[in-house]
Amino acid sequence: MAEKFDHLEEHLEKFVENIRQLGIIVSDFQPSSQAGLNQKLNFIVTGLQDIDKCRQQLHDITVPLEVFEYIDQGRNPQLYTKECLERALAKNEQVKGKIDTMKKFKSLLIQELSKVFPEDMAKYRSIRGEDHPPS
């Protein structure tokens, strides 16, 4: 899989370099540089075709739109990954807190029910395979 990305990266780098060189030619255009301009335009067309071929190999890859927004804003796209991981960690901690609270509630509920309904709770524990009442 990394080979496909490397291939695309190589074509993109060549394409960007051709665009840069085209900008230099156009910014100081002389009639004598027409042949060089035509050559660069042909390289750009070929580069776009090469990139399109790479696209077909990577059709199953999806990139969240937020990553493109980060790039458009001049931010590092790796910050998106970092922030997603931080949000997932925070959500994980929140859910863990809820689970811990429910476990404590269950334990307290069983203790109180054991005080009020000792015979029924003994049956419950035997069905559940628990030998001793929770402390």
Curated annotation (Swiss-Prot):
Protein keywords: Activator, Nucleus, Transcription, Transcription regulation
Major subcellular location class: nucleus
GO molecular function (one): ubiquitin protein ligase activity
Gene Ontology process terms (BP): positive regulation of transcription elongation by RNA polymerase II; positive regulation of transcription initiation by RNA polymerase II; protein ubiquitination; RNA polymerase II preinitiation complex assembly; somatic stem cell population maintenance
Any one cellular-component term (Gene Ontology): mediator complex
Record localization: Nucleus
Keyword Transferase: no
Superkingdom in the source lineage: Eukaryota
Keyword Transport: no
Homology family: Belongs to the Mediator complex subunit 10 family.
Subunit record text: Component of the Mediator complex, which is composed of MED1, MED4, MED6, MED7, MED8, MED9, MED10, MED11, MED12, MED13, MED13L, MED14, MED15, MED16, MED17, MED18, MED19, MED20, MED21, MED22, MED23, MED24, MED25, MED26, MED27, MED29, MED30, MED31, CCNC, CDK8 and CDC2L6/CDK11. The MED12, MED13, CCNC and CDK8 subunits form a distinct module termed the CDK8 module. Mediator containing the CDK8 module is less active than Mediator lacking this module in supporting transcriptional activation.
Function: Component of the Mediator complex, a coactivator involved in the regulated transcription of nearly all RNA polymerase II-dependent genes. Mediator functions as a bridge to convey information from gene-specific regulatory proteins to the basal RNA polymerase II transcription machinery. Mediator is recruited to promoters by direct interactions with regulatory proteins and serves as a scaffold for the assembly of a functional preinitiation complex with RNA polymerase II and the general transcription factors.
Database matches in PANTHER family: MEDIATOR OF RNA POLYMERASE II TRANSCRIPTION SUBUNIT 10
Record-given protein name: Mediator of RNA polymerase II transcription subunit 10
Source organism: Homo sapiens (Human)
